[in-house]
């Protein structure tokens, strides 16, 4: 049997998806509140930067993978307009339900679907843009997921990955204290779940750093891959193109 990591813990590959699902079933109802608290609201700026770089136009088709509570999908739906198509997808039903309801509350009607990023249920060369924000690190086979994203994007289209990354070295010690002490404490106080936020910190440390993710995206056939460090590398936006 093959092993992978669930945070720092080694688990069988067949177990990881279920463990990750448990985390997000637990945190779904408090997800947005915790994002604001954990990042000091910075996650909104990171997403705004991603939206600007995406450059979605009227009529575009966009796939938002692991779209959670729908921040990106909401913006893309407004930009793509009635002639476009924006799909909000997530592998976690609890997160998808929260995202769907949140979009409806904002008056945004867009299709939603349960979707495993390693087996995307769309044809080749279908979307102008595929995005995944804060989801790739939770996937068991990141290379397979990225290959699927490349498959469904059109020639000339983009795959964009917004994800926690390798922080600037002088900040590492302070960031570790925050990640492994403050985050679980916040998770317990606000969401009643310290363990899920301990996993969050661990999963960030196990995720490929900026240059490693560039190589991984290139290995699946994406080209002209570049990245933008945000907030001293706490987060990075990677952009790959298909030709």
Curated annotation (Swiss-Prot):
Methyltransferase required for the conversion of demethylmenaquinol (DMKH2) to menaquinol (MKH2) and the conversion of 2-polyprenyl-6-methoxy-1,4-benzoquinol (DDMQH2) to 2-polyprenyl-3-methyl-6-methoxy-1,4-benzoquinol (DMQH2). The gene is ubiE. S-adenosyl-L-methionine binds at residues 69, 90, 116-117. It catalyses: a 2-demethylmenaquinol + S-adenosyl-L-methionine = a menaquinol + S-adenosyl-L-homocysteine + H(+); a 2-methoxy-6-(all-trans-polyprenyl)benzene-1,4-diol + S-adenosyl-L-methionine = a 5-methoxy-2-methyl-3-(all-trans-polyprenyl)benzene-1,4-diol + S-adenosyl-L-homocysteine + H(+). It is an enzyme of class 2 (transferase). Its EC number is 2.1.1.163, 2.1.1.201. The keyword Iron-sulfur does not apply. GO terms for biological process: aerobic respiration; menaquinone biosynthetic process; methylation. Pathway: Quinol/quinone metabolism; menaquinone biosynthesis; menaquinol from 1,4-dihydroxy-2-naphthoate: step 2/2; Cofactor biosynthesis; ubiquinone biosynthesis. This is Ubiquinone/menaquinone biosynthesis C-methyltransferase UbiE.
């Amino acid at each position: 049997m093959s092993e992978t990591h669930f945070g720092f813990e080694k688990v069988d590959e067949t177990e990881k998806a279920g463990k990750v699902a448990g985390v997000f079933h637990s945190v779904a109802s408090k997800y947005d509140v915790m994002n604001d608290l954990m990042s000091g609201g910075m996650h909104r700026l990171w997403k705004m930067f991603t939206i600007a770089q995406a450059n979605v136009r009227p009529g575009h088709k966009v796939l938002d993978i692991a779209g959670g509570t729908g921040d990106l999908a909401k913006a893309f739906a407004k930009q793509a307009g009635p002639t476009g198509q924006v799909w909000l997808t997530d592998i976690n039903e609890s997160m998808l339900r929260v995202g769907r309801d949140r979009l409806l509350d904002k008056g945004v009607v867009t299709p939603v679907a349960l979707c495993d990023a390693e087996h995307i249920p769309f044809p080749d060369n279908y979307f102008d843009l595929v995005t995944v924000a804060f989801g790739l690190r939770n996937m068991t086979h990141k290379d397979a997921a990225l290959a699927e994203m490349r498959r469904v994007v059109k020639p000339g289209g983009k795959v964009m990955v917004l994800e926690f990354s390798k922080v600037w070295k002088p900040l590492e010690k302070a960031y570790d204290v925050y990640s492994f002490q403050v985050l679980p404490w916040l998770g317990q106080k606000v969401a009643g779940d310290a363990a899920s936020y301990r996993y969050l910190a661990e999963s960030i440390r196990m995720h490929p750093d900026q240059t490693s993710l560039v190589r991984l995206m290139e290995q699946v056939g994406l080209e002209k891959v570049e990245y933008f460090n945000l907030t001293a590398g706490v987060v990075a936006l990677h952009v790959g193109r298909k030709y």
